[in-house]
UniProtKB/Swiss-Prot annotation:
It catalyses: XMP + L-glutamine + ATP + H2O = GMP + L-glutamate + AMP + diphosphate + 2 H(+). PROSITE patterns: GMPS_ATP_PPASE. It comes from Methanothermobacter thermautotrophicus (strain ATCC 29096 / DSM 1053 / JCM 10044 / NBRC 100330 / Delta H). The gene is guaAB. CDD domains: GMP_synthase_C. One of its GO terms (molecular function) is GMP synthase activity. This is GMP synthase [glutamine-hydrolyzing] subunit B.
Amino acid sequence: MLNPSDFIEEAVEEIRSTVGNEKAIIALSGGVDSSVASVLAGRAIGDNLTAVFVDHGLLREGEAEYVRKTFSERLNFRYIDASEEFLKELEGVTDPEEKRKIIGRVFIEVFERVAEEIGARYLVQGTIAPDWIESEGQIKSHHNVALPHGLVLEIVEPIRELYKDEVREIGLELGLPREMIQRQPFPGPGLAVRIVGEITREKIEICRRANAIVEEEVVESGLHESLWQYFAVLTDTMVTGVKGDVRDFGYLVVIRMVESLDAMTASVPELPWDLIKRISKRITAEIPEVTHVALSVSDKPPSTIEFA
């Protein structure tokens, strides 16, 4: 059984002995995994750590502002807007596995540029057990696991043996705000794994707004306290609809809500029908490009939590 205090002491010592007096950067996303890893690394090497937040243009609504506000005064913090670079590389790509690999590669290219600039030798990552288990099992690549050959930086992964519930325990022991610890997981590739087919700026905005509506309604209902994840997926399916008395043709959006303890398995709970109806009405009313909303009822397995 995990003893948070013992784990923290051992992890800090391991990071310190590995990095020594060298400089390191950490890939900070604002999620609980990278946040916990950043605090552990900060305790171990202090000012020799630089936290790098990369905006790849695929973040959920308000995410960049949240991360900057939360971490800019806590750590040596660098914000990098690399959205143009990521979106250019993703042009015309439809295969979800290829999207994940491209995003992982571009992340590393950005981190290596920053590392060269500040003279860092190590890259600290918030990789956790489900990430590498799914990657090694060839279920899907994770951006922080499928790293390119020839990587210059040496990787440090202080929480790679932990599951999400254990990471949250460590976060609480470290004194991180409960609000941060309990945030629902958001995938490293961002909305790229919630957009089926080619990624375009129009699709990103549609998916971002649909996700925001789902999050707002779930939090308002209080159901967020029992759910692992809740989000919207923009499919590549176009469906006929009616706006007023006129035929319309727009996208199909899928709502997904699951319960889980560690992301290795997940189940779809009994959901309040009035909540689903509210979400559906808001999405079709507030996002004119969407004509239909569906609900995913598949557990993991056989499905994965994210669509792509």
